[in-house]
């Protein structure tokens, strides 16, 4: 996921970043092992996304490195929270349609929780990974959470396509991208005409 953020300009990677975690989550392994994988994924992502903190020239090297590590360690627990909530709902054997709506909603909720209070980190918002795609990022102007929702939905659809080998999921994946791009084009056209 970290590579999908600027300055790398690989925003499309955000559409797939959860897929390995979904495979791990659905394996027959202990919850504690799943938590470790989610934590490592979060830590790695934040280590890449916030690399600039360690390079902060406005402070000493020690403070910059400690701040950098603290960010990576602390915010990775939100990925653990996501894993725990998935585990809770996974025991309920929800339908595919409910999962398609609930899992993105959970991610959006967690990102919103992360952005509250003095430790808020809006620069970690996954919507920022789409800044290189003018048409796709426009949905943020309607509501920032829609972009997050669509990113997680794309991950779920592609995961379901790979794991279940049903074409309806890849068609849905492509449709979500096209609809998002169409909405973006309409918003850009409306902005340019005013």
Regions found by a protein language model. Give the residues of each.
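Membrane-embedded alpha-helical bundles of multi-pass enzymes
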Residues: 1-194
């Amino acid at each position: 996921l970290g590579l999908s953020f600027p300055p790398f300009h690989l925003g499309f990677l955000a559409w797939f970043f959860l897929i390995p975690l979904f495979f791990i989550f659905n394996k027959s392994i202990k919850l504690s092992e799943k938590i470790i994988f989610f934590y490592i994924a979060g830590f790695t992502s934040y280590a890449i996304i916030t690399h600039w903190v360690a390079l902060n020239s406005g402070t000493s090297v020690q403070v910059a490195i400690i701040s950098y590590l603290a960010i990576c360690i602390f915010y990775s627990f939100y990925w653990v929270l996501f894993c725990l909530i998935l585990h809770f709902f996974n025991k309920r054997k929800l339908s595919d349609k409910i999962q398609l709506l609930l899992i993105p909603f959970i991610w959006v909720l967690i990102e919103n929780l992360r952005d509250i209070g003095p430790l808020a980190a809006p620069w970690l918002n996954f919507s920022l990974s789409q800044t290189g795609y003018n048409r796709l990022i426009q949905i943020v102007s309607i509501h920032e959470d829609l972009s997050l929702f669509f990113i997680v939905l794309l991950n779920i659809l592609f995961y379901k396509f790979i794991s279940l080998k049903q074409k309806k999921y890849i068609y849905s994946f492509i449709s979500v991208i096209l609809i998002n791009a169409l909405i973006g084009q309409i918003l850009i056209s409306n902005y340019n005409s005013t």
